């Protein structure tokens, strides 16, 4: 009797426990609730994107040192197709207005009759591969203006029905072309190691750069950095700004005499920037602060006809975090400044000296560092 009682009691307890469990589950279960499935909407799509084939860059600067420049345009896919699929590439002249507006630039369209695509621009991605390339040739022309940047916006068109294009950025890549045929004294060939010369602006004439030549007559130095202007806090405006000491400003004011002769020989001239013992710094700007400072740097390069900038993260004090233009020092903040600078002047060089927080982040907003840093100058101690 006792055993029967215990078994019956255990069975009753299990029923009560199971009922409680089911009741508890019912409290958490919402039948018929709408679920946001937008995150899964593209899982079956095969998204295409466009790049320069040689560099794998979305935005590629091309310097014409000869009569022709050859490269390839690459279309990549997010998935491997089961069967061959295809698309075409073409020049999308209308897109240039959108691009110029986004970057606050005024690039002119490169003469379309000087650009040709092999195979009528048709790209065929074979089964079990994820990309295809087509040759593109850019020819020089008599009407090109020196010291002017032209743009070639290339777009995907006539794609097969199984190819999806996510947005305009994925659909396009752009070539920024400069005629350098008469400014080739420093050019030693594509992909050749370049020499960077940092010189102290307080007591050195930049034209001394032209005194150094190789045995073949080519100039030794490819890039000259004016070392250096500063980032400083503008108390009246309440934001960081570019500050030039009298010697830097003298070179800028007399750039036709002291700087442009270098550029006419093919030497790139960059404005060096570093901290200057106050609350601002190149690696401690907020996102908005970086955008504002980058736009000012771009205006300096445009106004004084310079080839870009070199950032050096030194000599900055702790930031005032109550200022919306500033943030804690970090490699992420430094990367943001480089990214925003490239956005503001895509045809110019954005370079950094590998010191402090100035280098070490791989992407900003999903964009690879090679798109917004052109050169990292190593610290040799």
Label every PLM stretch briefly.
Residues 1-11:
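Bacterial N-terminal signal peptides that target proteins for export
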Residues 11-19:
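Hydrophobic helical h-region of N-terminal Sec-dependent signal peptides
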Residues 16, 123-126, 284, 325:
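Short N-terminal micro-motifs specific to bacterial/archaeal maturation
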Residues 16-17, 136, 276:
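Short intrinsically disordered, low-complexity segments
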Residues 20-24:
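C-terminal motif of bacterial Sec signal peptides marking the signal peptidase cleavage site
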Residues 26-218:
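Acidic/polar, low-complexity intrinsically disordered N-terminal segments immediately downstream
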Residues 187-206, 218-381:
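Chitinase-like catalytic core of GlcNAc-active glycosidases
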């Amino acid at each position: 009797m006792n055993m029967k009682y215990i078994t019956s009691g255990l069975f009753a307890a299990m029923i009560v426990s199971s009922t409680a469990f089911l009741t508890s589950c019912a409290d958490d279960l919402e039948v018929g609730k709408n679920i946001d499935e937008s995150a899964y909407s593209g899982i079956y799509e095969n998204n295409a994107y466009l790049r320069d084939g040689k560099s794998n860059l979305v935005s590629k600067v091309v310097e014409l040192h000869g009569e022709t420049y050859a490269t390839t345009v690459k279309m990549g896919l997010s998935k491997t197709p089961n069967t061959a699929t295809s698309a075409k590439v073409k020049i999308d002249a209308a897109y240039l207005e959108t691009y110029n507006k986004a970057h606050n630039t005024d690039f002119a369209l490169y003469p379309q009759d000087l650009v040709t695509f092999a195979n009528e621009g048709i790209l065929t991605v074979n089964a079990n591969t994820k990309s295809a390339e087509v040759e593109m040739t850019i020819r020089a022309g008599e009407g090109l203006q020196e010291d002017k940047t032209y743009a070639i916006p290339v777009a995907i068109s006539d794609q097969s029905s199984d190819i999806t294009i996510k947005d305009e950025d994925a659909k396009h890549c752009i070539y920024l072309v400069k005629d350098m045929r008469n400014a080739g004294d420093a050019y030693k060939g594509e992909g050749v190691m370049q020499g960077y010369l940092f010189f102290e602006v307080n007591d050195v004439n930049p034209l001394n750069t032209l005194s150094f030549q190789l045995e073949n007559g080519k100039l030794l130095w490819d890039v000259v950095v004016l070392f250096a202007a500063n980032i400083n806090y503008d108390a009246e405006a309440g934001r960081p700004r570019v500050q030039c000491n009298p010697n830097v400003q003298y070179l800028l004011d007399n750039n036709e005499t002291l700087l442009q002769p270098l550029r006419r020989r093919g030497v790139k001239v960059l404005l060096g920037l570093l901290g200057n013992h106050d609350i601002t710094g190149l690696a401690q700007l907020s996102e908005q602060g970086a955008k504002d400072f980058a736009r000012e740097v771009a205006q300096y390069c445009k106004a004084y006809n310079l080839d870009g900038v070199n950032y050096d993260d030194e000599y900055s004090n702790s930031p005032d975090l109550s200022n919306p233009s500033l943030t804690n020092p970090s490699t992420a903040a430094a990367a943001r400044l480089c990214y925003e600078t490239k956005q503001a002047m895509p045809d110019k060089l954005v370079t950094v000296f590998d010191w402090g927080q100035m280098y070490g982040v791989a992407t900003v907003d999903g964009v690879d560092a090679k798109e917004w840093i052109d050169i990292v100058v190593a610290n040799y101690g």
